[in-house]
Amino acid sequence: MNELNTKHIVIIGGTSGFGLQSAKTLLVKGAKLTITGRDKNKLETIIHELKAISETVAGKVLDASKEDTLKQFFEEIENFDFMISMAGGFMGGGFLDAPYETIKNAIDEKLFLNLKIARYAANKINDNGCLIFTAGSGGRADNASGAIIGNESISIMVKGLAIELSKRKIRVNAVAPTWTKTPLWRNMNKEEVKNIETYFSNTIPLGRTATIEEVSSAYIFLIENSFINGQTLKIDGGLTLL
């Protein structure tokens, strides 16, 4: 029997990109899923598609940036074994040219939003479980200032949480992908997206960007490997080696 057959897994931000692909893989592996999304209609469509894989999936509308709804979400859901958080934004601009509020918001959306999620999740996760957050890899401090701080803060946060939750044998890790072509960029001009992809392909040592499947498999790996704790797994093709 697959060891995920009896496991309840929550994915915050599971209607597109890495979250959706992770959901598909976990359903194939027999897990019971609760996924969230901000858009009710999109969430319903995705749940319908996922039920073609397995009926063991449910959806909850959630805007994680609103603390009252975040608190209510965790109060209402059943206890779970694993959680994946895709929460966090992105930004461009250096420390001198980006608006102060833009930098501050980028940090808030990465560190403090995920810290709130961690605190609520700690009360609902079963012993021997795992919390997985999303950081980022390969950005430059001079053109992604707030995002860099936020991503580094996630790595520090998971180390602290891993120790604090170790008495309950709960692991805490993060996945840090570099730029990947996902629906996150759907509102950007196609030519601009192509230029960004070309830039990263020419910069990454492997000569290309990652696929959604390659990144999402890291979340699955961290769920299934029960001896990885307090780590941030960089999925960047060696970009941070440069």
What feature does the model see in each segment?
Residues L96-K116, I154:
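Catalytic Tyr-X3-Lys loop
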Residues T15-G17:
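Conserved glycine-rich cofactor-binding loop
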Residues S85-K104, R186:
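Conserved mid-core segment of classical short-chain dehydrogenase/reductases
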Residues K40, R140, A176-N187:
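Short, flexible catalytic-loop segment of classical short-chain dehydrogenase/reductase
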Residues A106, I117, C130-K167, W179-T180:
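Catalytic loop of short-chain dehydrogenase/reductase
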Residues S155, L165-K181, I228-I235:
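Conserved Rossmann-fold SDR core element
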Residues L50-E67:
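Rossmann-fold cofactor-recognition segment
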Residues R208-I235, T240:
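C-terminal substrate-recognition "lid" of short-chain dehydrogenase/reductases
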